[in-house]
Amino acid sequence: MFNNSIHKVSICIALTLTFSANAMAVTEIPFWHSMEGELGKEVDSIADRFNQSQPDYKIVPVYKGNYEQSLAAGIAAFRSGKAPAILQVYEVGTATMMASKAIKPVYQVFKDANIDFDESVFVPTVAGYYTDSKTGRLLSQPFNSSTPVLYYNKEAFKKAGLDPEQPPKTWQELAADTAKLRAAGSSCGYASGWQGWIQIENFSAWHGQPIASRNNGFDGTDAVLEFNKPLQVKHIQLLSDMNKKGDFTYFGRKDESTSKFYNGDCAITTASSGSLASIRHYAKFNFGVGMMPYDADAKNAPQNAIIGGASLWVMDGKDKETYKGVAEFLQYLVKPEIAAEWHQKTGYLPITTAAYELTKQQGFYEQNPGADVATRQMLNKPPLPYTKGLRLGNMPQIRTVVDEELEAVWTAKKTPQAALDNSVKRGDVLLRRFEQANK
């Protein structure tokens, strides 16, 4: 009896030790990101399902603030030897990450993990933003890519006597529509998020105009800024005139306009396609999604939109097992059913051709009119060498410069020409600083 009890206790101890050993064998992989609200919930959901799908790795998502904050936190953590394994970085941080010496290229991560990963699964216009210009290999993995789109309140349109199924196609139409919307009682006719990305960078690409020389920096770090040309100045003048009339309202440098839209304050906003998740969740009215407006007088417009959003960078200095887990997770993210779900639930672009095709097969676009607008904008025309994106050093700081200068326009302290001229002048100083630091 006594010996039998000892035997049972021994078995229990052995099982406990076995389970403990198995638990200890799980490799935790920190994943720092900037997805909050509904987007953060979806990141957590995907990570949980990956963790449950296998016993060896545990992805640990950690929200680290907005894009600027998470990039700064990631670089600082790398310098102190405490970097996460995966860091989500917005698209304008690409040149900074490439020059940081803090990363392990994604293609190398897969190679070292003995995973035969086909980089051609990604939509070319998305992957091209994150590839090495010389080798064409992926440096980071596309994740939440977006383009700006136009959201409009169908009920406000109807009240103003406008066709709720016809969003404005040109900036001239938008200006006329917002005046009618305001007259019909809308406190805010039009607002825009991410003004540098939407009103300068994407406006330029959408009209077939370069943002900088050297094909927007893809061909070298000696690029200079070029967005102070007549077409861009004319556009900012139109917004300035609308602002003076009260038809365009400026709420901030990031996506503040999104909440103003889904709260019903603003009848129209231009914002990231990735804002669709929160708008769909919070809006208590019927809304529509339209393409970005274009200048009716511009030749050959619209051209193609350029992506925003972010990609996933793998940080250097981790052990072999961590990189194996990272590779497994990155491969999991591009499974057609996972990538399609991420696209459908968030409004971000389908990053793989298979995800796009699966979404079509499932009838998602037919059931959700407007959900394919971002994709159609990106594929509207084959990109020109200077409309496939931008790769400029110190771009986060350049965006801050643009924000400061445009704010001077909205407060009537500067003319559009003076503001854009000064943006280019100040921005070029930042480009030369980056060029010198990375020779």
Swiss-Prot record:
Chain residues that bind sn-glycerol 3-phosphate: 67, 91, 146, 272, 309, 348, 399
Tagged with keyword Transport: yes
Predominant place of localization: periplasm
Keyword Lyase carried by entry: no
InterPro entries xref list: Bact_solute-bd_prot1, SBP, SBP_1_CS
GO CC annotation: cell envelope; periplasmic space
Alphabetical UniProt keywords: Periplasm, Signal, Transport
GO BP field: transmembrane transport
Pfam family, one: SBP_bac_8
Cellular localization per UniProt: Periplasm
Signal peptide: 1-25
Protein family membership: Belongs to the bacterial solute-binding protein 1 family.
Its job: Part of the ABC transporter complex UgpBAEC involved in sn-glycerol-3-phosphate (G3P) import. Binds G3P.
NCBIfam families in UniProt: PRK10974.1 (NF008211)
Subunit structure: The complex is composed of two ATP-binding proteins (UgpC), two transmembrane proteins (UgpA and UgpE) and a solute-binding protein (UgpB).
Protein's name in the database: sn-glycerol-3-phosphate-binding periplasmic protein UgpB
Species: Yersinia pestis
